[in-house]
C-alpha cells in the first residue's frame, strides 16, 4: 500500500510478516522518480505487542545507467554515514542523475536508535550477519533483504563506517585485495575517486559475515570508510563523506563531470597482522602518538596504566612495524586484547590500476 508523508513525495511500505523481507512488487525499482520507502518489520515489545520498525529506503532512478547502493548505520554508534546519506536523500533530485541511487541511511536502525554497535533487539552485529537469513532474527532478516533485494540490483556498494565509540581513525576509505584483477582495478579507481586522505587496503581480523565479503563474492565493487570515530561527528569527517559521495557519483557517471580538482588519496595497507596492536592488560591507555604520525618498529607509542596495581610501572606499547598510525583506541579505559592501535604502510597500487582482463 502507499502512504503519503507530508515532507516527502511518496512512501511505500515494504511489509513482512512470517516470511522473507521483500518488496510487494518491483515497480519502485523499475520506474523513474524519487521514492521514499519504508521497510516495515513487525517488532513486538513489552510496550507494543503489535508494533513495527520502519527502515527507510530511498530509491532515485532516472533511466538506464550504473546503479549504486549507499548504506550507513551498519553499526549504531557510527554517525558520518547516516548524516551524510540523510542529506543526500534530501538534496539529490531525479533529474540530477543518470542511472539509479539507492540509499539506506540507517542499516541497523535499532542500533542507531540505541546508539550501540550491536542491535539491542537480538544482540547481533549487522556486519557479521550477511548474506542474512530470511527465517532468522531481525538483524539477519534485514541483512537478507539488503543482500537479496538491494545488492543484487547494484553495480557498486558503498558502506559508511567510522570508529564508533571504541576507536578513532585517520579518515580513510577501506578496500581489500581481491583475486579478480578487473574487480580489483575498478575498486581501486572507485576508492581513488572518493578522495579520502587515505585509502586503506585492509587485512581484516575476521571477515566472515561482513557486507564487504558478501558483495565482493558476488563480483561487485565494494568500498567502505572509516571516518573518525569516538561517537561524534566532526566538520572534517562529514565534509570528506559528503564530497566523497559526489566524487564517486561523478566517477560512475551517475552525476555529470565537473572541472573541480579532487585531492589525491594516499594508498596504504596493513601488510600483516603485525600492524594490529592489542592491549596486553586492562587499564588506562595513554597514547603518545597522534593519528597520521609516522612510527618506527620498537617505538613506544603508548602506555597502559593499571587501575589496581598502583605500584607497578605502566606497560609500554611498542610498534611492531614501521609505518603510520591510522587507528587508536577511542577511550582511555581498555580491556585486555582490545585493539588499541593499527599501523599501516604505503602501498603502490599502479599494478592494480593497469592489470586487468581488458
PLM features per residue range, with description:
Residues 2-358:
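Structured catalytic-domain cores with a bias toward divalent-metal coordination
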Amino acid at each position: 500500500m502507499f502512504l503519503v508523508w507530508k515532507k516527502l513525495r511518496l512512501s511505500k511500505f515494504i511489509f513482512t510478516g512470517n516470511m522473507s523481507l521483500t518488496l510487494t512488487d518491483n515497480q519502485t525499482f523499475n520506474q523513474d522518480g524519487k521514492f521514499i520507502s519504508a521497510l516495515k518489520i513487525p517488532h513486538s515489545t513489552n510496550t507494543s505487542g503489535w508494533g513495527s520498525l520502519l527502515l527507510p529506503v530511498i530509491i532515485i532512478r532516472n533511466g538506464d545507467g550504473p546503479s549504486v547502493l549507499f548504506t550507513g548505520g551498519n553499526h549504531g554508534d557510527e554517525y558520518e554515514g547516516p548524516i551524510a546519506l540523510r542529506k543526500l536523500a534530501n538534496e539529490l533530485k531525479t533529474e540530477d542523475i543518470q542511472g539509479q541511487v539507492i540509499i539506506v541511511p540507517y542499516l541497523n536502525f535499532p542500533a542507531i536508535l540505541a546508539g550501540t554497535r550491536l542491535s539491542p533487539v537480538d544482540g547481533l552485529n549487522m556486519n557479521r550477519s550477511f548474506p542474512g537469513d530470511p527465517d532468522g532474527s531481525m538483524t539477519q532478516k534485514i541483512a537478507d533483504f539488503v543482500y537479496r533485494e538491494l545488492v543484487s540490483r547494484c553495480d557498486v556498494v558503498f558502506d559508511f563506517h567510522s570508529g564508533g565509540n571504541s576507536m578513532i581513525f585517520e579518515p580513510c576509505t577501506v578496500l581489500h585485495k581481491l583475486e579478480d584483477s578487473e574487480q580489483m582495478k575498478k575498486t581501486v579507481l572507485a576508492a581513488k575517486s572518493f578522495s579520502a586522505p587515505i585509502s586503506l587496503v585492509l587485512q581484516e581480523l575476521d571477515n566472515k559475515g561482513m557486507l564487504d565479503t558478501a558483495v565482493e563474492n558476488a563480483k561487485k565493487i565494494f568500498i567502505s570508510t572509516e571516518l573518525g570515530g569516538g561517537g561524534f561527528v566532526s566538520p572534517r569527517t562529514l565534509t570528506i563523506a559528503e564530497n566523497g559521495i559526489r566524487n564517486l557519483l561523478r566517477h560512475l557517471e551517475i552525476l555529470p563531470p565537473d572541472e573541480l580538482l579532487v585531492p589525491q588519496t594516499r594508498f596504504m595497507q596493513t601488510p600483516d597482522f603485525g600492524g594490529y596492536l592489542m592491549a596486553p592488560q586492562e587499564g588506562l591507555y595513554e597514547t603518545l602518538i597522534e593519528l597520521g604520525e609516522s612510527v618506527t618498529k620498537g617505538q613506544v607509542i603508548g602506555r597502559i596504566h593499571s587501575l589496581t596495581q598502583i605500584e607497578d610501572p605502566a606497560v609500554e606499547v611498542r610498534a611492531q612495524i614501521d609505518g603510520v598510525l591510522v587507528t587508536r583506541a577511542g577511550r582511555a579505559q581498555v580491556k585486555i586484547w582490545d585493539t588499541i592501535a593499527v599501523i599501516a604502510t604505503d602501498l603502490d597500487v599502479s599494478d592494480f590500476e593497469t592489470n586487468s582482463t581488458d
